[in-house]
């Protein structure tokens, strides 16, 4: 059985992320979305909110589960008996950074990374950009799953 992890902060999860999850789920028996905790960052959504939003947005993927993690992603992979890391790439800049990380993960732990080129319709989408556009009153319905859009709108209204 082959399994892979899709790591990230997912603050919040976007349709670009969902596209990568769907494509990874078609290639591996099991996908674990690892919502990684960075103690140096405070996100808009709590860890539990991010997990719930991903779960709600991926109910159509029976071989996908969502967990939290922190520390080295290679430790997360090994602890769960997974075999690979899957990362989405939007731009050449993403590739340069992710290639370095992939080479380090291979060197340190022998774990391979598989890159998925983001669909052109999502190549410009990022969590940060979606939040920024939403904060300025823009329409982000084409960037986010419906549940995420609803929760983001509510969270921005709470903040005033």
Swiss-Prot record:
Pfam families listed in its UniProt record: CTP_transf_like (PF01467)
Protein family per UniProt: Belongs to the bacterial CoaD family.
Keywords: ATP-binding, Coenzyme A biosynthesis, Cytoplasm, Magnesium, Nucleotide-binding, Nucleotidyltransferase, Transferase
Annotated site residues (Transition state stabilizer) in this chain: 17
Role: Reversibly transfers an adenylyl group from ATP to 4'-phosphopantetheine, yielding dephospho-CoA (dPCoA) and pyrophosphate.
UniProt-listed InterPro entries: Cyt_trans-like, PPAT, Rossmann-like_a/b/a_fold
Name of this chain's protein: Phosphopantetheine adenylyltransferase
PANTHER family hit by this protein: PHOSPHOPANTETHEINE ADENYLYLTRANSFERASE
Organism in which the protein naturally occurs: Mycolicibacterium gilvum (strain PYR-GCK)
Subunit annotation: Homohexamer.
EC number assigned by the record: 2.7.7.3
Catalysed reactions listed for this entry: (R)-4'-phosphopantetheine + ATP + H(+) = 3'-dephospho-CoA + diphosphate
Domain of life: Bacteria
GO molecular-function terms, A-Z: ATP binding; pantetheine-phosphate adenylyltransferase activity
Cofactor(s) in the UniProt record: Mg(2+)
Enzyme class: transferase
Metabolic or biological pathway, per its Swiss-Prot or TrEMBL entry: Cofactor biosynthesis; coenzyme A biosynthesis; CoA from (R)-pantothenate: step 4/5
Coiled-coil boundaries: none
Gene3D superfamilies attached to this UniProt entry: HUPs
A biological-process GO annotation: coenzyme A biosynthetic process
